[in-house]
């Protein structure tokens, strides 16, 4: 009797496993898509924190917290001067909303890696409509940091 119950339990486990496999194959659970979404969320958090530095004219701090790739391409003084020339005249941020975000592993003129390109619809005191693009990347130490910023 005990052997019969064990055999039934093993069959039940097998049926449950087969059912799970069937459901997963029917609905196509995509592990990569889930990891891309997690990366997008982590990158979005970092981008928002970084934008607060820029919004508060903490340009040196924004450079300090940027990705190594960014810092090797732009010296701190140049970064500060560029933001003072182009970002400061826009005035205070009025509103900012995520327009799109996309995970990618390659970008033009950048090393292969993990990036999330985030576009924001923004409104400033002196520019009612702008698109800000912030590109965090997974840095060598495993932390997300901003590697690019562009205002259009």
Language model segments and positions:
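Bacterial N-terminal signal peptides that target proteins for export
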Residues: 2-17
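Short solvent-exposed beta->alpha transition segments
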Residues: 44-45, 60-113
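Bacterial N-terminal signal peptides
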Residues: 17-26
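Second-shell loop/turn segments in exported
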Residues: 34-37, 48-51, 66-71, 121-123
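Alpha-helical hydrophobic membrane-insertion segments
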Residues: 5, 25-28
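Short, low-complexity N-terminal intrinsically disordered segments enriched in polar/charged residues
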Residues: 27-58
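Exposed beta-sheet edge and beta->alpha loop/turn motif
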Residues: 100-152
């Amino acid at each position: 009797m005990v052997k019969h119950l064990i055999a039934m339990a093993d069959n039940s486990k097998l049926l449950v496993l087969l059912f799970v496999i069937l459901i997963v194959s029917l609905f196509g659970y995509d592990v990569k898509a889930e990891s891309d979404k997690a990366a997008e969320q982590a990158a979005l958090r970092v981008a928002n924190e970084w934008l607060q530095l820029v919004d508060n004219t903490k340009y040196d701090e924004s450079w300090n917290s940027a990705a190594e790739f960014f810092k090797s391409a732009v010296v701190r003084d140049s970064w500060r001067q560029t933001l003072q020339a182009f970002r400061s005249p826009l005035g205070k941020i009025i509103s900012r909303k995520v327009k799109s975000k996309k995970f990618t592993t390659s970008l033009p003129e950048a090393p292969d890696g993990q990036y999330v390109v985030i576009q924001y619809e923004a409104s400033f005191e002196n520019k009612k409509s702008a698109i800000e693009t912030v590109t965090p990347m997974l840095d060598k130490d495993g932390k997300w940091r901003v590697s690019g910023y562009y205002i259009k």
